[in-house]
Amino acid sequence: MKSRFSIPEFCLSHWLLRIPLAIVFLQQGLSKLPFSLEDAEAFDLPGLVWWFVIYGEIGAGIGLLVGGIMTKPWLPILERCYIPDIGDAITRFSGITICSIMTGVIWVGQPDSLMDVILYDNLHVFLWVGGLVFALRGNRLT
């Protein structure tokens, strides 16, 4: 006997993780502009590292959104040149960038132990895990 009810498929549920993560990284990156060496020195970082952090955060936020949009050819003109793997690669690279930045943030905090990170630095751990999800799964979260 066939059931009348079935579990709905939530094929767009990846946006529930993608949008907040992108907003956090865009907001953090844009709040660091304009670039200044004084801000870098406040965290004992070289200027070049600070520059990569700023543009890495902005790029990762934009990359998560663009990579998600590129899952389908939304415009008819894009159907001829549509390559789904490009959106997946952008999403994965953005996830790797997020993991790298969050590893640096946790490292700069100089925690005493791994338990201190897990118990008291949970926001950064959650952001790191969110980046790890997109780095490992890309656009294939469904």
What are the functions of these language-model segments?
Residues 1-34, 50-142:
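Extended, low-polarity transmembrane helix blocks
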Residues 38-47:
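Perimembrane loop-to-helix junctions flanking transmembrane segments
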